Amino acid sequence: MKIDSIIVAGYFVIVFIAGYFVSRHYKKASAGDFITGGRDRTWYQVAFALFAMAADPAIISLCGLGFLWGFYIIQWNSVHMWFTAWFAAMFIVPIYWRSRIVTTPEYLEKRFSLPCRSLFSLLLMAALIITLSGAVYLGALLLENFLGWPLWSSMILISAIIGFYVILGGMKTVLTMDFYQGIFVIVTLVIVIVAVVNKVGGFAVLANSSIISKAGVSIHTIVPPSDWSLTTTKFFPTQAILAWAPITGLAWLSCNFSMAQRLLAAKSEQDAQKGLLAVAILAVFYPLASFVVGCLMRIKMPDILPDEAFIKAILVMVPVGLRGILIAGLMAALLSTVDGMLTASSALFTEDFYSRIIRKDATPTELKKVVRIAEILTILLTLALIPIIRKADSVMVFIQDFYAYVFGVTIAIYLIGMFTKKVAPRSGFIAMITSVALTIALDVFSDVNFAYIGVFSFIVTIVMFFSLSVFEKQPATAVDLENLTVHTLSDAKGPWVGLKAWPGLWKWALALAASWVVFSFCWEAFMRSLANS
């Protein structure tokens, strides 16, 4: 345990020193570069930064899902990323890139109205800060469980390290740090899966298991169960995966500013597109490791709690020393997620509220100062919310419900704005508010599965928008929609606008879809061959 503590402490020291030198290098960056990252990242830098942001400590929660529901849950992640990344690269990235937005809510103002922008930005900031508090708490809990470090001291340490290099160097520093930490996270996951699989006796143990998951299917199958009931308690049956995963995946990549901020930092539109497709593959890798470990722990330790599966795997199956490296890898995932949320929430406040509403004539120097103050206040608010989060039954359930409430509504508005020329700003705002309210009511007063609630919010928003827009008077003067829809891009028109910057995009999109099918068949064949040997 002492050796592990030394390794993790050494990792924190390295991050602190690296953060200091990288921050010093970017300390004099302009206000725009401080917020956006300078728009100079190559596609692989974008991909690793996106991956580091996505691969947070929820790895532990995913392991628990694999323990309880089985390996088929990976289909959610596959559809969630592989079938939406190409869509976002083809249609959404060209619009974001040409419209030169700084935050994702800014698109809603350019396309619809300022109230739409302000509402979504406010909701997104709230979600980011709550998720940030949960991530810091979870990271400190890991250090307490694995190494015996004091909980509050660990939370303050994590916040201080991240706050130091984020506040000093801004988004450019975050992108540089996340690139290397993303690589470290991948190495960590490889070590975890190799160590656990070898310890339990190989994949044959999983293939020969007769354990039935809570979903009623074999724990090792990749085929999801079928359930047509809207009130099903199963976690992502086939119908829910096909209906909700593409919607929430597209929203997560396109509307969620903490992810889109990294796309907007690419040095070209093509780099953003390539980075998006690359992370679609990488982002399925960490659930693969988590679910395999969860399933194997169900076989070896069936009596433990699902959320203990990952922790027990490291404590029992990984030797001292190597355990410290793995914990450091988990901390890398944590830091990359937390620094991304910190920069995103402060940028949202600065761009969507301070410079747009509070002080429109703010100078670049003033904006840079405001960003730093917002980051300090966000860290303090994050720590202040942790006692409340500790009392909550499940922070992750709350966040999951929030995304069902908001992301289905928001991506519907975005898609309407991008694929139609209809100008109806009031209809957009009313549809957003009403749909969110109806979605919350449906969740509170019914037993409908949260995935179907998200689909409901998506459909209701579209129907309500077009119904209301019939009665909305069109503006007397023509509205400039240049670079705001797929029909009005300045240099690319037609259904496949993404091919303008990257003509080979369609080939890689097909390859990505084919990879999903091949992976599914190969996994099932692999399990059956081991079971029959």
Where are these regions (language model features)?
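Membrane-embedded helix-loop-helix hairpins and adjacent transmembrane boundary segments
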Residues: 1-533
